[in-house]
Amino acid sequence: MSDIHSLLVAAILGVVEGLTEFLPVSSTGHMIIVGHLLGFEGDTANTFEVVIQLGSILAVVVMFWRRLFGLIGIHFGKPPAHEGQGSGRLSLIHILLGMIPAVVMGLIFHDTIKSLFNPVNVMYALIVGGVLLIAAEVLKPKQPRAVGIDDMTYRQAFVIGCFQCLALWPGFSRSGATISGGMLMGVSRYAASEFSFLLAVPMMMGATVLDVYKSIGFLNMGDVPMFAVGFVMAFIVALIAIKTFLQLIKRISFIPFAIYRFIVAAAVYVVFF
């Protein structure tokens, strides 16, 4: 690829990554389709996708930096505003409980999970994840037991972590799994989304660093500009996407996202079959 072409491809994929990483629509499904259409596939493409995820993670850190530092007892000025009706407070224990199930499952079945990265499995994951979103909207308690993120219990955090295991299935969507699990456990749509974003930082950071380490042999200095463009675009777009998403879910349900997932699944079928 020419330099200009490779930078353009990097910018497009950075936008796709940033736009879809934290929405319940599966960034994996979108990256597979767009990467295929752009002719950007193989080991370098896989490493590129892993690296630009760091841009999306950085966007969450920037958005929730005060809350993240507060979880480890570091406060700059006033503590983050209390979000809830009770007197509880989200703690690092909630995050750890939300991480444990997927970390354990991911370590045990790492090689099996990697073997699932193909269009067929992604297509089915998109469909099943869409059904789960609809089920969460239909079956969730009429009155959430955790209105704000600080109302969440340890049990709710752990069960959300169990739902996160579904995201080990490529194409399922980590945010879709965790948000659906939270809503079914009586966490409000907004609080479940916030917790999903906070949970993403250690989960994605750990997985990304591990993948980068294992892919280091496919990196070379000539790829740095392309990777940098993808990283920056993913960061900027993810920042905008997160802000917009949190405002949007105050007004609409996740049904439109579920329908969109079915459309993407159909697109995967058309493109690859």
Swiss-Prot record:
Gene Ontology molecular function: any one: undecaprenyl-diphosphatase activity
InterPro entries xref list: UppP
Location(s), subcellular: Cell inner membrane
GO biological process: cell wall organization; peptidoglycan biosynthetic process; regulation of cell shape; response to antibiotic
Cellular component aspect of the GO annotation: plasma membrane
Residues spanning the membrane: 13-35, 45-65, 90-110, 116-136, 157-177, 190-210, 222-242, 252-272
Catalysis: reaction(s): di-trans,octa-cis-undecaprenyl diphosphate + H2O = di-trans,octa-cis-undecaprenyl phosphate + phosphate + H(+)
Membrane topology: Multi-pass membrane protein
Keyword field: Antibiotic resistance, Cell inner membrane, Cell membrane, Cell shape, Cell wall biogenesis/degradation, Hydrolase, Membrane, Peptidoglycan synthesis, Transmembrane, Transmembrane helix
Enzyme Commission (EC) number: 3.6.1.27
Note: Bacitracin is thought to be involved in the inhibition of peptidoglycan synthesis by sequestering undecaprenyl diphosphate, thereby reducing the pool of lipid carrier available.
Stated name of the protein: Undecaprenyl-diphosphatase
Organism (species): Klebsiella pneumoniae subsp. pneumoniae (strain ATCC 700721 / MGH 78578)
